């Protein structure tokens, strides 16, 4: 069976992963040799608790694809401020630099207010 990392990277070429959400996941998981190697703290940095599952909530590729499919039409807004992230590297969404720990990645600000 393919590793989840291989599955995601290969799937990045499909329409599923042409969404910004999919590109983010493909980029993030590429830093890990295996899904289980992603540290729980890193997962908490990526997601706010507002109805977005954490990385370690996905036990297999099927659940991951379902999540991407369920969110493929979601517009993502990001903050335009420099924040440190877990890998000390930049990541751009629509030309804007974001950090992995920004809670606005999935549409919420620090206070949990929905942005879109």
Question: What is the predicted role of each segment?
Answer:
Residues 4-11, 70, 80:
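Proteolytic processing junctions in secreted/extracellular precursors
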Residues 6, 19, 60-63:
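Intrinsically disordered, low-complexity segments used for protein-protein interactions
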Residues 14-15, 89:
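Residue-level detector of beta-strand structural context in well-folded domains
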Residues 15-19, 26:
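A short beta-strand micro-motif
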Residues 25-112:
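Acidic, low-complexity, intrinsically disordered interaction modules
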Residues 115-116:
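Short acidic DE-rich linear segments
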């Amino acid at each position: 069976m393919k590793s989840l990392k291989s599955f995601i990277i290969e799937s990045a070429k499909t329409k599923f992963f042409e969404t910004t959400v999919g590109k983010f996941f493909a980029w993030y998981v590429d830093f890990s040799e295996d899904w289980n190697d992603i540290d729980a703290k890193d997962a908490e940095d990526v997601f706010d608790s507002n109805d977005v599952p954490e990385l370690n909530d996905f036990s297999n590729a099927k659940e991951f694809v379902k999540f991407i499919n369920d969110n493929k039409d979601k517009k993502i807004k990001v903050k335009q401020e420099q924040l440190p992230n877990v890998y000390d590297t930049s990541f751009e969404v629509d030309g804007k630099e974001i950090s992995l720990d920004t809670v606005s990645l999935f549409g919420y600000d620090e206070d949990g207010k929905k942005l879109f």
